[in-house]
Swiss-Prot record:
GO terms for biological process: dUMP biosynthetic process; dUTP biosynthetic process; nucleobase-containing small molecule interconversion. GO terms for molecular function: dCTP deaminase activity; nucleotide binding. It comes from Halorubrum lacusprofundi (strain ATCC 49239 / DSM 5036 / JCM 8891 / ACAM 34). Pfam families: DCD (PF22769). This is dCTP deaminase. DCTP binds at R105, S106, S107, L108, G109, R110, D123, T131, L132, E133, Q152, Y166, K173, Q177. Keywords: Hydrolase, Nucleotide metabolism, Nucleotide-binding. It catalyses: dCTP + H2O + H(+) = dUTP + NH4(+). The active site is at E133 (proton donor/acceptor). Homotrimer. CDD domains: trimeric_dUTPase. Residues 164-203 are annotated as: Disordered.
């Protein structure tokens, strides 16, 4: 079941669902979603001539991105073909019985701005800001202003609460994130199978 505006307001009032700061409830709470605003921090991917990026090598990923801060009221220009990581202004806390989905606002979609590439799911138990995968599929640069509403968060009630919500187990590598976070795929267990086997052998 997808939560309506009345359901969302009830859960926010109960305190187990958190979206903060929610500065303008009338404007941000939509019929079945909450509008989230663009934060001030961006991770830009550098032009590079190296043969490839190895996602499992944290140093390579870190060298590939630089952080830019754009104060509210100023503009971040997203050029055609560019891809950057942004963040929401709001910090969220998703209770174990809800799943959240991030969608871009249609008004930006009509300007060829994509808000997320693949990461549309916010797991039960997640706490933190949400990283946005911003790209410009159009032919003209588009000015994005921190503080503008860029995405919608939709909440679906689960049939039963998650037994292992995000943050409970190892591997919750983006829990409590502050600002945009580059890929941490290198910490996934499948890339450390030899280490895991060695640890099991020693024990």
């Amino acid at each position: 079941m997808i939560l309506s505006d009345a359901d969302i307001l009830d859960r926010l009032a109960e305190g187990d669902l958190v979206v903060e700061p929610l500065d303008d409830v009338d404007q941000q709470v939509q019929p079945a979603s909450v509008d989230l605003r663009l934060g001030e921090r961006f991770l830009e991917f550098q032009r590079t001539n190296i043969p490839c990026i190895h996602p499992t090598e944290a140093d390579e990923v870190g060298d590939y991105v630089t952080e830019t801060r754009v104060p509210e009221g100023e503009e971040f220009i997203l050029h055609p073909g560019d891809f950057v990581l942004g963040t929401t202004t709001e910090r969220v806390e998703i209770p174990p019985d809800l799943l959240a989905t991030v969608q871009g606002r249609s008004s930006l979609g009509r300007l060829a701005i994509v808000i997320h590439a693949t990461a549309g799911i916010v797991d039960p138990g997640y706490k933190g800001q949400i990283t946005l995968e911003l790209s410009n599929l159009g032919t003209a640069p588009v000015a994005l202003t921190p503080g503008m509403r860029v995405s919608q968060l939709i909440f679906t009630e689960l049939k039963s609460p998650a037994k292992r919500p995000y943050g409970v187990e190892r591997g919750s590598k983006y829990q409590d994130q502050d600002g945009p976070q580059a890929s941490r795929i290198g910490s996934d267990p499948e890339f450390h199978s030899d280490e895991n086997q060695a640890a099991e052998h020693e024990s």
